[in-house]
Design a protein with these regions (language model features):
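Charged, often glycine-rich, active-site loop that binds/positions anionic groups
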Residues: 11, 15-18, 22, 190-203
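Loop/turn elements at helix/coil->beta-strand transitions in domains of secreted/extracellular proteins
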Residues: 49-52, 102, 146, 175
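Acyltransferase
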Residues: 133-135, 159-183, 203-226
Length: 249
């Protein structure tokens, strides 16, 4: 069960809730946020329902639920994995990626799902020299002389600082170096948010029109559907992002 419209219908969206499936719960507690639009995918992996899930991410929808549910999630570079058939938000940011319990399995899955797809132009940019053997570097010396950037988060708490230090020391012991990155910017920023609004309108219209036997063929149709069925689909939050996207175009 995934978040309604990938958390892109309302600024008041509830992660893990959909009008079809109800509320997805965080694996560690009923009162904790399952996070991200791929919340159900992360919980299914963590709780052992599946070995592998394929999440989708525009901005945090793989990394966040993977983080808070204690699994491994990878958001690949856009264009490495085909997005064909996936409900779009942003053609410049959307991608699919593996969600598993181990780095090794995540690397194997990424190798399997990566590659050229004539139905997704973003994959045209994959270098011809790409081997897709992402598991080949999973050795004890795989991090030797590698520099890894780590966004600093939670350092204001004692346990958070201890975990950051543990990450740094563990990677150093394996021959790598951690560079802590301070980033206080808000996401999405105004420019990025407008781009998301614009690309969503264009992308969702094209996606809906490519499907047969649907009663909706545009963002405007979706807005009208939600308004007509608000008691079911808008129980907890509205559709202000949909309105903004319609106006942005």
């Amino acid at each position: 069960n995934l978040s309604e419209w990938a958390n892109f219908r309302s600024t008041g969206s509830v992660s893990g809730w959909s009008s079809l499936g109800g509320q997805t719960l965080n694996s560690y507690g009923r009162n904790l946020n399952p996070c991200g639009s791929s919340s159900g995918s992360a919980v299914a992996v963590k709780d052992g329902l599946v070995e592998v899930a394929i999440g989708t991410e525009t901005n945090g929808s793989i990394s966040c639920p993977a983080s808070v549910n204690g699994i491994v999630g990878i958001k690949p570079t856009v264009g490495l994995v085909s997005r064909h058939g996936i409900v779009p938000i942003s053609s410049t940011q959307d991608t699919a990626g593996p969600m598993t319990k181990s780095v090794a399995l995540a690397a194997q899955v990424l190798s399997a799902i990566s590659g050229f797809d004539p139905k997704d132009k973003a994959t045209y940019n994959i270098p011809s020299t790409m081997t897709f053997n992402f598991a080949d570097d999973l050795s004890l010396d795989g991090l030797k002389n590698k520099r890894l950037g780590l966004l600093v988060s939670g350092q204001e708490y004692e346990i958070g600082q201890k975990l950051l230090d543990k990450i740094k020391n563990t990677i150093a012991a394996l021959g790598g170096e951690v560079v802590f990155i301070e980033d206080n910017r808000e996401y999405p920023g105004n420019d990025e948010y407008f781009l998301l609004l614009y690309e969503f309108k264009y992308g969702i219209d094209k996606y809906l029109q490519s499907k047969k036997n649907l009663n909706v063929s545009s963002l405007d149709d979706l807005i009208k559907f939600n308004e007509a069925n608000k008691d079911e689909v808008m129980q907890y939050f509205d559709q202000d992002i949909f309105y903004q996207s319609e106006e942005a175009s």
